[in-house]
Amino acid sequence: IESPAQTRLNKKAQVETFEELAITSSLVRPAGASYCLQFIDRHRKMKMGVRDWEFLHPSLEPILSETHDVCAFQEDVTKICHHVAGLSFKQADKIRKMMNSLHEGSVEDRLWIETEREFLAGCIKNSGLTVEQARELWMRVSSFTGFSFCKSHSASYAQLSFKCTYLKAHYPAQFLAAVISNNHGFYSKDAYINEARRWGIRILPLDINKSGIKYVGKHNWMRPGIMHVRNLTDKTSSRIVEEKGIREFANVEDFISRVGAYRHEVENLVLAGAFDGFGLNQPELLYVIDGIYGRHRSLAENGLQFDVFGTRDRHPNHSDYSLTEKCLNELHILGFMLSGNILDILDLHPKSKGTVPAGEIANFVGKGIKVFGWPVTERVHTVSTTGKTMMFLTLEDQTGSMDVIFWPRNYGRFADVLAKPGPYEVWGKVTEEWDTHCLEAVNIRSAEWSPSQIDFELASQRLTRSAGYVYTDLPGIVAA
C-alpha cells in the first residue's frame, strides 16, 4: 500500500478498514483500474449515507453489494457468469482464465465472440436482463481483463499491510530499520532513511564496534549496518561480527590484524565513517592504512614477516574532510548520504529561491508554484484511448514527498530531461481531487551537478544549518 497509486487510491476512497483495503488492493491492478473513480465516488457517498445510484440489475446486488456495483475481484466475474448468465462454474472459470490471459489472434477472437453470444443469451434467459442491460454487463465483465486479484489474495495483502502499518505507527525505528535491512520495499533505501528523519528518528553514525550487518532501530534512533558498504564481502562482514563479539576493535591496526580484510574494504569502511570513533579523522586513517598495506607488500617482497602494529602512531596531522566531502563519499560508498541531503549541498532547499516545500503544496491548490525534489519513483503510462505516453513522478525533499504528473502534451517535450537522474526543479499547477494533491507539471529542469561544481565550504555550512542529520552517539546506546 506504499506505492503512490495505492496511497492515492486509499486516501481518495477514505480507506479505514481491512475489508476496504482488500477491495482497493485489487482495484488498483490493471483489470480493475478503470473502475476506480466510480468506486471512489460511490464509496465516499455511502460513507456519508448518500446513495444516488442503482445496481444495473437486482441480480447483481448479492454479488457486488460490497463494491457498489463494481467488479473488483476475479470471483466477481465468475459469480456473474454463473448466477446471472446461468453458465456452469466450469464455463465461468474458463471465462475468468481467458480474461487473465487474453491475447489477440483469430482463434482467440472467434472464441471470445462465441463466449459473448452465450453470455448475452444467458443473462436475458436466466435473469431477465434486457438486451441493453446484458450488453452493458458484458462490457463491464469483458473490460475486466488483464492482471487482477482473487479476493483471498487481496485479503492476504491487506492483512500484511495492516500489520506493517501498525508496526510503522507504533515502532517506526524498528520497522524502517527492518525494511531497509531486507532490501527495502517499493522505494530505495535512501527514501526510507529520509522518511525516518521526517519521523524524528535519529540516524546514528556507522560504527565498526556498534553496527551489525543489518540496520537496527529502537526508540527514536536507528543504527546503520555495514551491509551497504561497497565491495564489502560476506566473508569479511561475518568475520567483523565474529571478532567484535569476542572483544571490541581498539583501532584500525587491531581491526586489520584480526579481520584480515582487503585494503579496498578497509578504505571503504573508513569513508563510510565506520572508524570515526578511533580518535583519528578519515584522512589520517587512510594514511595509516596506506602505511600498513604498503609495509606489508614491501616485507612480503623481501620474504620478511609482517607486523601490523609496526606503523602505529606513524602519521602526521591531516585536515579532516569537510561535511560535504563526507556526504559525497557516503553517496559513493553506501549509495546514499548518511550525513546530509543532496538538496542542501546543491542549495536547492525548500523555501529558498521561491520554491514551495513538498509538505506545503496543499496550501496552493489552483496556483502555479515551483518545487525542488529528488526523484524517488516514476511510472510511465500509455493512455489506452489515445496511445500517447504520460508520466507519474514522485519527488522528495526534506519535508516530504509530492506527486507530479506530466500529461502527454508535456511528457513528450520533457522526456529527455526526465531521463536524467535529477534532482529536478519543476514548475506546475497544484490540483486537488478527493483530498489528494498533485502538481501538474508545465516545465522542468534537471539540476545537473558534479563534485567539481560544488562550493564545498558553502555547502558544508548549509548542511550544518540543516537540522536532523549529523548525530554523535547517544548515552546508553550499545552495539547492535
Predicted regions and their residues:
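Noncatalytic, beta-rich nucleic-acid-contacting surfaces in large DNA/RNA-processing enzymes
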Residues: I1-A480
